[in-house]
A protein has these predicted regions:
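Residues within the alpha-helical elements of helix-turn-helix
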Residues: 30, 79-80, 95
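Membrane-proximal linker segments that couple transmembrane helices to downstream signaling/catalytic modules
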Residues: 1-12, 16, 20, 29
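Helix-turn-helix
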Residues: 28-35
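Terminal helix-turn-helix DNA-binding modules in bacterial transcription factors
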Residues: 12, 16, 21, 44-89, ...
């Protein structure tokens, strides 16, 4: 297998299961390689860790929910795989630059909290 095949498999795995708990071990198993190898390869090819990629992907998905649904922030956090609302808020603000509520309002999303 080419290195890019492993990365593609890892990304597909994350993108189809982001709403569930995912560990680096799970990603490695899906790719059929050891954890250390996929971590090293992912960082080399994507310039980020698997964990950070997963978090950013979850935040991207949460933005879609915030704009296109009237779900509460807590519900959105749960739908995208965050089981800790404080951690979701912290990561959302770190990545997007504003809170989920501010983002929803700035994008004209439905205003329910």
């Amino acid at each position: 297998k080419q290195n890019t095949d492993y990365i593609d498999t890892a990304i597909r795995f994350i993108q189809t299961r982001y709403d569930s708990p995912i560990s680096v071990d799970d990603v490695a198993s899906a790719c059929g390689v050891c954890k250390e190898y996929i971590q090293r390869l992912f960082r080399k090819e994507r310039d980020t860790s698997i964990k950070e990629y997963l978090i950013k992907y979850r935040i991207e998905q949460s933005c879609k929910y915030l704009i296109n649904t009237d779900h509460s922030v807590a519900m959105v956090a749960e739908l995208v795989g965050f089981n800790d609302i404080k951690y979701f808020y912290m990561k959302f603000k770190e990545i997007v630059g504003m809170t989920p509520i501010q983002y929803k309002q700035s994008q004209g999303g439905l205003n329910r909290e």
